[in-house]
Swiss-Prot record:
Cofactors named for this entry: Zn(2+)
Keywords, ordered alphabetically: Cell inner membrane, Cell membrane, Membrane, Metal-binding, Transport, Zinc
Localization, UniProt: Cell inner membrane
GO MF annotations in UniProt: zinc ion binding
Chain's gene name: dabA
Protein name: Probable inorganic carbon transporter subunit DabA
Residue sites binding Zn(2+) per the record: 339, 341, 501, 516
Family affiliation: Belongs to the inorganic carbon transporter (TC 9.A.2) DabA family.
Organism of this sequence: Xanthomonas axonopodis pv. citri (strain 306)
C-alpha cells in the first residue's frame, strides 16, 4: 500500500493557518443540527445567506450534487394553469443578470420546456476509487463513520457508552486502529495508517492536504464537499460549535470530523495509486475554479421568484378583501395570546368567529422569557427560548418546600427505577428471556396502545418559578418589555389567556419538531405559566401602573396549552384560583371547545384518512400514524401588524401572525426585535420546509417508515450510516402530491419604510436575507395593504443595482 505517495503533490506547501482558516470557513458553510430531544427547524442554506439563490445553486451543486429549485415541469404546470402569469415572469427576468438571463420572455418560455441538466457534485477520492475498483467506498466510509459516531454522540440510548476523552478525532483513532472492516474491503494497511497519523486533528488536516496535493484555491470547495458527505454528523459537530459560541467558547468537533474524513481520502488515494491520479487532478482543478452561476441557475431562480410573486398576488388579494370580522362595543370578553406559529392562525380565526367579544393576539411562543428550565425532579436545563439566544434566567418546577422536596425525591427514585428496568429489558442476557417471562403483563398495555385507546394528558407539572428569585425591579422591567413587545398595553379583558403550544403524539422521533420552535423545540406552557404569574403579581401591576400600563384589578391572566395535533386547549386554572372568574372560565372553556371543533374540521380536510374531526384525536394516539398533523407545511408569509388587518380573513394556516402597532413603538425597538428574532426564526422554518421539498436527498430526513433512532440524537434510514437531517418526506408530501409549496417567505410589516430600512442597515446579516431574496420584504399601509416597501437586489459577482420602492402592488 502506497501511503506516502508524492505523485499528486502538485502544489507548494501551504501554511497551517491558511489551511485551518479554510476548514473553519467550510464548517460555517453547513447548518447545525439540533438533537431530537429539542429539535428545531434550521435553515439548510444558512451558510449561503450572503449570496443569491443562483450562486447558492452553483455552490451546492458542486458540494452536494443537488438542485435548490423544483424541476422545470413544476413551474411549467403552474404557468399553463394560469397560476403564474407573464407579469410574474417579466419582473424577475428583468432583474436577473443580463449576461446570463434569456434575452426575451419567449426565450424564457422555451427554456421552461427544456430539461434541466442533472446536478453533479465534484467527485471525492472515495467516489473515484469506487469507479475504478468497483467497491462502494463512499458507502463503506459512511457506514464506518456512522457506526463510530452513533456511539460517540450517544445521549443515553446505548447500553455501553463510548469513551470521549480527548475529543472526537482522538476517540475515532482508537476505534479505527482496531477496525479491520476497511482492510477486508481492500484498503490494506488502513489501521496502521491511522495509528501513524498526527495525534492532533488540525495537524492531520494539514498533513492530508499535502498528501492529496490540494492547492489553496481548492481548499474551501473540497472541505465543504467532504463535510456535506458526512450528512447530519457534520451538522451535529456544527451544532456543538454553535452552542459553544453562544457562551463565548468554541468547539473543535466539526474540525475533528473533517480530519477523520480526510484521513479516509488520503488513505484511498495512496491505496489507489496511479489509477486515481488523472481523475483526482481533474477534480482538484474543478474545486479550485471560482463558483459561478450558469444560465440554467439564473433561469431556475427567475422561475422560483415568479412562483413566489404569484403567491404574493393571492395574499394581497386576501388582505384587500372586505373582512367579515366585527368589532365588539365596549370591553372585550376574552383575550387570548397565541404563538405566531401558522397552526395558530386556524384556531384564532375559529375562536374569533364565535363571538365579537373575543380578541386574539400573536406573539413569539416563548413570550419574551428567555429561560433555561429544570423540570420537576430533573437537573437537565432545557433552553426554552429561540436557539439564536442564550438563557438569561433559570427556572424550576414547584415550590421550595419540604413537601415539594419529598415529592421531588420520590419522583427521582421512580425515574431511576424505570431507567433500570428499561436497561434490564435490553441487556445482552436478560433480553432473551424477558418477553417469555413478562409478556402477559404487557398485554393490556399493548392492546391499549396498539388500538390508540390510551388517553393523553397535557403537561401538568407544578407551576414553574425562577430558581433563585427575581427582585421587583427585574420583574417589572420584564413585564413592561413583554407587554410593549406584544403591543398589549391597554384594553385588558377580565380574562386574558396566554397559550403556549405543543403537540402530543406517539412513536414519533421528530415529536419535538412539532412543539414550539420559539421555545427551542419544547412545548410552550412553561413560559406561558411564568408570564401569567408575573402579570398577576400585585407588586408588578402597581409598578406597571406607574409606568402608564394600567391593568384592571379584575383582570386575570391564565396560562394554557394549545395541542396543535388535536386542537384541544388545557387551561392551567389551578395556578391562579379565582372564584370570581368562574363564569368567565366556564364560558372560555365552551368557546375553546367549539373553536377546537371548527379547527379540527378545517384541518381534517387536508389530512389523509381524516374524514371526521374525531379522527384527528385518534391519529395523535396511533403508533402507526406517520402524519399526525401537517405542522408548518404550507407556511408562506409573516405578517407583523395589528390583528384588525388580518382578522376574519382566511389565511389557510399559512401565515405567521405577529401583533404589532408601530404607533406605540417609540424608537422602533419592538420593530427591531421582530426583524431580528421572530422573522429570522420564521425564515429558518420556511427554508427548512423549502429545502426538504426541493432537495429531500440532502436536506430531508427521508422515509419515516425506514427510520431508526440512533444515539437518541437523530435518525438513520435502515441499519446505520449517514444521520439524516431536515424533515421526513411524509411531512411535505401526502403520498400523491406535495402538501408544502416551496416558496421563500414573504415578510409583510406595517411600519414606516424608513424605520425598516434603518434597522436593516444596523443588522447586515438580517439585511442579507432580504438583499439576496431568501426572504421577500413588503411594507403595509394603514389599511393593511402593500405600500412602498423593499425589493432589494445584491449580486456580489455582478454589478450591484440599488433597491427600489414600489407602490400599491407587488412589483420589482
Amino acid at each position: 500500500m502506497l501511503m506516502t505517495t508524492t505523485t499528486t503533490a502538485m502544489s507548494v506547501s501551504l501554511s497551517h493557518d491558511v489551511i485551518i482558516a479554510a476548514a473553519q470557513r467550510a464548517a460555517r458553510a453547513i447548518p447545525p443540527l439540533w438533537p431530537l430531544a429539542s429539535s428545531v427547524a434550521v435553515n439548510p442554506f444558512l451558510g449561503q445567506a450572503s449570496e443569491p439563490l443562483e450562486m447558492a445553486a452553483a455552490r451546492l451543486r458542486r458540494a452536494s450534487g443537488i438542485a435548490v429549485t423544483m424541476p422545470r415541469h413544476w413551474y411549467a404546470e403552474r404557468l399553463q394553469s394560469g397560476e403564474i402569469t407573464e407579469d410574474d415572469l417579466r419582473a424577475p427576468l428583468q432583474n436577473a443578470p443580463a449576461a446570463l438571463r434569456p434575452p426575451s420572455l419567449s426565450a424564457l418560455r422555451h427554456a421552461i420546456a427544456a430539461t434541466r441538466p442533472s446536478p453533479q457534485a465534484i467527485p471525492t477520492v472515495a467516489e473515484l476509487a469506487r469507479d475504478t475498483a468497483a467497491v462502494d467506498w463512499p458507502g463503506i466510509v459512511n457506514e464506518r463513520i456512522g457506526h463510530w459516531a452513533a456511539g460517540y454522540f450517544d445521549q443515553g440510548q446505548a447500553l455501553w457508552a463510548v469513551g470521549r476523552s480527548g475529543g472526537a478525532y482522538s476517540t475515532w483513532r482508537i476505534i479505527a486502529t482496531h477496525d479491520l472492516t476497511p482492510e477486508i474491503a481492500g484498503l490494506a494497511g488502513f489501521a496502521r495508517y491511522v495509528a501513524d497519523a498526527p495525534a492532533n486533528a488540525e495537524d492531520a488536516i494539514v498533513d492530508c492536504v499535502a498528501r492529496l496535493g490540494l492547492s489553496q484555491d481548492a481548499l474551501d470547495g473540497y472541505f465543504h464537499r467532504l463535510l456535506t458527505t458526512l450528512g447530519g454528523w457534520g451538522q451535529l459537530g456544527r451544532y456543538r460549535l454553535w452552542q459553544a459560541e453562544l457562551s463565548g467558547a468554541t468547539d473543535a468537533c466539526v474540525t475533528d470530523l473533517l480530519a477523520i474524513r480526510m484521513l479516509w481520502e488520503a488513505a484511498l488515494l495512496g491505496n489507489g495509486g496511479c489509477a486515481l491520479v488523472p481523475g483526482w487532478r481533474t477534480a482538484i482543478a474543478a474545486y479550485a475554479e471560482p463558483v459561478a452561476a450558469t444560465s440554467d441557475d439564473v433561469i431556475d431562480s427567475i422561475l422560483q421568484e415568479a412562483a413566489e410573486r404569484a403567491a404574493q398576488r393571492k395574499l394581497n388579494a386576501v388582505l384587500a378583501a372586505p373582512s367579515p370580522a366585527q368589532v365588539a362595543a365596549g370591553r372585550v370578553k376574552l383575550q387570548m395570546a397565541f404563538c405566531i406559529d401558522v397552526r395558530s392562525e386556524v384556531f384564532r380565526r375559529a375562536l374569533e368567529s364565535l363571538d365579537s367579544g373575543i380578541q386574539t393576539l400573536g406573539f413569539a411562543g416563548f413570550f419574551g422569557l428567555g429561560i433555561g428550565h429544570r423540570r420537576f425532579a430533573s437537573d437537565v436545563v432545557e433552553a426554552r427560548l429561540p436557539v439564536l439566544l442564550a438563557p438569561g434566567v433559570i427556572t424550576c418546577a414547584g415550590d421550595a418546600t419540604a413537601s415539594a422536596a419529598a415529592s421531588d425525591l420520590s419522583a427521582r427514585i421512580a425515574a431511576r427505577a424505570k431507567r433500570a428496568w428499561g436497561r434490564f429489558k435490553l441487556a445482552a442476557i436478560s433480553s432473551f428471556a424477558f418477553v417469555e417471562a413478562t409478556g402477559p403483563i404487557y398485554v393490556a398495555k399493548l392492546l391499549r396502545d396498539g388500538l390508540a385507546l390510551a388517553r393523553q394528558h397535557a403537561p401538568n407539572e407544578p407551576a414553574p418559578r425562577p430558581a433563585d428569585g427575581l427582585d421587583l425591579e427585574t420583574r417589572l422591567t420584564m413585564a413592561t418589555r413583554i407587554l410593549k413587545a406584544m403591543s398589549f398595553t391597554g384594553g385588558f379583558a377580565r380574562l386574558v389567556v396566554l397559550a403556549g403550544h405543543g403537540a402530543k403524539v406517539v412513536n414519533n422521533p421528530h415529536a419535538s419538531a412539532l412543539h414550539c420552535g420559539a421555545c427551542g423545540g419544547y412545548s410552550g406552557e412553561v413560559n406561558a405559566r411564568l408570564l401569567a404569574s408575573l402579570l398577576n403579581d400585585s407588586q408588578v401591576r402597581a409598578g406597571l401602573a406607574a409606568r402608564g400600563i394600567v391593568i384592571p384589578a379584575d383582570t386575570l391572566f391564565l396560562a394554557a396549552l394549545h395541542d396543535t395535533t388535536t386542537d384541544a386547549v388545557t387551561l392551567y386554572t389551578a395556578d391562579h384560583p379565582s372564584p370570581g372568574h368562574a363564569e368567565d372560565l366556564a364560558q372560555a372553556a365552551q368557546w375553546l371547545a367549539a373553536a377546537g371543533a371548527l379547527a379540527r374540521a378545517e384541518r381534517a380536510a387536508r389530512l389523509p384518512r381524516a374524514h371526521r374531526s374525531q379522527d384527528i384525536a385518534h391519529r395523535a394516539r396511533d403508533w402507526a400514524e406517520i402524519r399526525p398533523e401537517w405542522a408548518l407545511a404550507g407556511c408562506q408569509a409573516f405578517i407583523a401588524a395589528p390583528r384588525s388587518r388580518t382578522a376574519g380573513r382566511d389565511l389557510a394556516g399559512r401565515a405567521f401572525l405577529h401583533d404589532y402597532d408601530w404607533r406605540y413603538d417609540d424608537g422602533f425597538g419592538v420593530l427591531e426585535l421582530i426583524l431580528t428574532a421572530p422573522v429570522v426564526v420564521a425564515s429558518w422554518i420556511s427554508l427548512q420546509y423549502y429545502g426538504s421539498t426541493v432537495a429531500p436527498e440532502s436536506f430531508g430526513a427521508g422515509n419515516k417508515l425506514l427510520h431508526n433512532v440512533t444515539g437518541g440524537i437523530g435518525v438513520v434510514e435502515g441499519n446505520g450510516g449517514i444521520l439524516r437531517t431536515g424533515l421526513p418526506w411524509q411531512s411535505v408530501h401526502d403520498g400523491q402530491r406535495l402538501t408544502h409549496e416551496p416558496l421563500r417567505l414573504s415578510v409583510l410589516i406595517e411600519a414606516p419604510p424608513e424605520a425598516i430600512a434603518n434597522i436593516l442597515e444596523r443588522h447586515p446579516q438580517v439585511r442579507a436575507l432580504f438583499d439576496n431574496r431568501w426572504l421577500h420584504l413588503f411594507a403595509l399601509d394603514d389599511e393593511g395593504l402593500i405600500r412602498p416597501g423593499f425589493r432589494r437586489h445584491s449580486r456580489p459577482s455582478l454589478r450591484v443595482a440599488p433597491f427600489k420602492l414600489y407602490r400599491g402592488q407587488v412589483a420589482s
